[in-house]
Amino acid sequence: MRVADWIWKTLADWGTEHVFLVTGGGAMHLNDALGRETRIRYVCNLHEQACAMAAEGYARISGKPGVVSVTTGPGGTNALTGVVGAWLDSVPMIVISGQIK
């Protein structure tokens, strides 16, 4: 089992049902593993900031942590505005970023 497979399996075991993501080369193993985890639905966005804000809204409404998956470099930093907003309001969020190495 790859680490990427373990991440999504574990989150699914913990009750995660939705992930907000932007695909990218640095996160391809994560994207591939997520596509094979049948218990989690993914919502593709066009920008990482939108993923983080959607996850924050999801967490506020559902009471479950919002989960974000982004690619490396700018993908991770683009999500920061939404992450800081969630942190300031104590909204639970899990952010996973790919890594090239």
What is each model feature region?
Residues 1-101:
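N-terminal alpha/beta PP-like core and its mobile active-site loop of ThDP/TPP-dependent enzymes
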